[in-house]
Amino acid sequence: ENEDTDLLLPALLEGQNYGAAAADGTQGPSVSVSRNNPAKRNYLVVAVLCFGNLINFIDWFIVPGILLDLQKYFGLSDGKTGLLQTVFTLCYMLAAPIFGYLGDRYNRKIILGAGIFFWSGVTLGSSFITQSHYRIFVLSRGLVGIGSASYSTIAPTIIADLFEEGKRTTVLSIFYIFIPVGSGCGYMLAAGMAKSTGDWHWALRVTPCMGALALLLLILLVPHRIQRRTAAHRARSISGMIRRADEKPDVHTAAKTTWCQDVGSLVKNCSFVCSSLGQTAMAFVTGALGVWMPLFLYRAQVVQGIVPPCLQESCNSSNSLIFGGITVGTGILGIIAGAEAARRLRKKNNKADPLICATSMFISSLCLYIALMVAQTNILSTFIFIAFGELFLSVNWAVVTDILLYVVTPRRQSTAIALQILVSHLLGDAGSPYLIGVISNAVQARNSPSLQWSFRSMQYSFVICAFVGVFGGGFFLLTSFYIEEDRKEAQR
């Protein structure tokens, strides 16, 4: 009962502190204050957020699922093809700090709803773009990226406000499972719709319907105001090793600071900086794999004589389906394994989280390198090593976010997530698909046109991903040197 009383005052004051009150002055329900089984309502909110995250990443990876069809339809080189995902990611990362600023100060439910409505509408509109309007198609992908940024920046902070200690790790793991699940479903949905209809445009007409459902669920099931926890409740170890704070939430700790002050504080946080650079390496590798791997596998099969070259618009989509299935399966297993490993090892080592991330990055890089080397001779071995590479990459998703949530004070967490998105995409997957395509073009230009060099150009381009993954592991190792001190600072 004391906890209910402690949480009541910040919930009532949230509208004053962050501008969360509705314009007409109506009072929305508060999750933490609800006496009708608040735990059940919290899980309903998480279910809605997970569904939205699923749609978010399906939209993200629909285009890579039909990449070969798009190349034939618009007549694109590898470089121009990679530009599609680069534009999406650039707009995504540039919008993220804006939504981080808004999410720390204004009503998060309204921002989420506007983002879902915007990206779903643009996706539907892009499905009607004709062959002569490639630039409009590129622009539409950028606009979808802006809408997606609102969701990825704000949704994790809502989950962090609803749960604490061990539960937060579990719930965040469930939320982040929908990154690989959504990504894999994006490949499979795109390939399946293109194959069944004979027209890739239909692949872009499914998720807007799902987005409309997500928006309806958001309106009906997510409270208008969700109480923001203070540092005493949130900025502590997820493992529960640090004892529950005795002081009551102090509304004065939520005093406003400028965005520049928030950024200045975050830049001095070594754990945040190093883990963000580690995640940047993750983003570089996953971005390149996500866009180019189905096409790389197709070219490997062509060189081996397993499939014929695609000379028409509706191309073989089996690699997108298989790679999508691998992404879903390894993503679920990896995130669950990462969360469980973190939960167990934190009891023995306070530096367990960054060490888990570093180890998984090193192993993933090795598996990816082996997959590239055997691709020309054994396609089955290639699939196996790609699966292991993706499995160990997926281990990090929830763990990296967990690190951020306990080394950054709560009132700066939306900004921290936004900055992490900005850095990881600016130096990671914003450029990696385009870079891989440009290197592939350069290799092909220096050799005579052939199916063999079409494959080798992509193979040589991908090698850079293995080395970037090793650098990512190094940054996570650096994080382990600072994480204990920064965690204590966040608690204070």
Predicted regions and their residues:
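Residue-level signature of mid-helix packing/kink "hotspots" within the transmembrane helices
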Residues: 61, 89-97, 149, 183-184, ...
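Helix-loop-helix hairpin linking two adjacent transmembrane segments in secondary transporters
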Residues: 175-227
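Structural signature of the two symmetry-related core transmembrane helices
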Residues: 110-125, 353-369
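Conserved MFS/SLC helix-loop-helix module at the cytosolic interface between two early adjacent transmembrane helices
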Residues: 94-134
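Cytoplasmic helix-loop-helix junction between adjacent transmembrane helices
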Residues: 140-180
